């Protein structure tokens, strides 16, 4: 039986952990050096609820320089992973400010999973000290859940690509969301206008 194919696009601020999350899930290795993404694709097979799914993983660049290029990733998307970093409250702030409007414009009706990356840094002393200097603290789980409700996300997950904690669960939830997505008579995927 042929696998069902679904397209997943990951978005979020630059350096919030998008590429690491995809690489750990698809290749099971954590990249130690940071290289800003322009456009990368990976494919991974996943089984959920007895269904074999081939996930096409589309990585995107979060940097503003790529705001005009990123929409090329959106057509025919089945599910969006919208990421922020738990060690960066500013990246959470950009979820409603930047990422939700962009995604809802290009991908109306496509389910969104809100993902808090770098969960391992929430209790990291160095991270807490650095944030305290700016009168900030790591994002709390309830702040992530509240944001997911606010933007109408399908769900909220937290993970650490570094420790692999929660990584598989993120993609299981995303796959379920992609499989459940209601398709109207017309294909209701993303549009580029």
Curated annotation (Swiss-Prot):
Q: List the keywords (alphabetical).
A: ADP-ribosylation, Cell cycle, Cell division, Cell membrane, Cell projection, Cytoplasm, Cytoskeleton, Disease variant, Ectodermal dysplasia, Glycoprotein, GTP-binding, Host-virus interaction, Hydrolase, Isopeptide bond, Lipoprotein, Magnesium, Membrane, Methylation, Nucleotide-binding, Nucleus, Phosphoprotein, Prenylation, Proto-oncogene, Ubl conjugation
Where does this chain carry the motif Effector region? 34-42
Where on the chain is 5-glutamyl serotonin found, per UniProt? Answer: 63
Matching PROSITE patterns: RHO (PS51420)
The way its activity is modulated is described as:
Regulated by guanine nucleotide exchange factors (GEFs) which promote the exchange of bound GDP for free GTP, GTPase activating proteins (GAPs) which increase the GTP hydrolysis activity and GDP dissociation inhibitors which inhibit the dissociation of the nucleotide from the GTPase. Activated by GEFs such as ARHGEF2, ARHGEF3, ARHGEF28 and BCR. Inhibited by GAPs such as ARHGAP30. Inhibited by GDP dissociation inhibitors such as ARHGDIA.
Lipid-conjugated positions (S-geranylgeranyl cysteine)? 190
Outcome recorded upon mutating residue 34 to F: Abolishes AMPylation by Haemophilus IbpA
Which disease is given in the protein's UniProt record? Ectodermal dysplasia with facial dysmorphism and acral, ocular, and brain anomalies: A neuroectodermal syndrome characterized by linear hypopigmentation, alopecia, apparently asymptomatic leukoencephalopathy, and facial, ocular, dental and acral anomalies. Patients show no intellectual or neurologic impairment.
Q: What is known of its domains?
A: (Microbial infection) The basic-rich region is essential for yopT recognition and cleavage.
What name has this protein been given in UniProt?
A: Transforming protein RhoA
Q: What gene codes for this chain?
A: RHOA
């Amino acid at each position: 039986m042929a696998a069902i194919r679904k397209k997943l696009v990951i978005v979020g601020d630059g350096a919030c952990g998008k590429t690491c999350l995809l690489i750990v899930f698809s290749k099971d290795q954590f990249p130690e050096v940071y290289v800003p993404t322009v456009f990368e694709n990976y494919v991974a097979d996943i089984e959920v609820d007895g269904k074999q799914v081939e996930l096409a993983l589309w990585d995107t660049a979060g940097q503003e320089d790529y705001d005009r290029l990123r929409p090329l990733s959106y057509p025919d998307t089945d599910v969006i992973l919208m990421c922020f970093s738990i060690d960066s409250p500013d990246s959470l702030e950009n979820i409603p400010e930047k990422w939700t409007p962009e995604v809802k414009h290009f991908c109306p009706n496509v389910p969104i999973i809100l993902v808090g990356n770098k969960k391992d840094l929430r209790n990291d002393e160095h991270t807490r000290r650095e944030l305290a200097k700016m009168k900030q603290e790591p994002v709390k789980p309830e702040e992530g859940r509240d944001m997911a409700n606010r933007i109408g996300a399908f769900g909220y997950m937290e993970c650490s690509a570094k420790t692999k904690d929660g990584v598989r669960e993120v993609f299981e939830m995303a796959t379920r969301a992609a499989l459940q997505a209601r398709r109207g008579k017309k294909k209701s995927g993303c549009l580029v206008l």
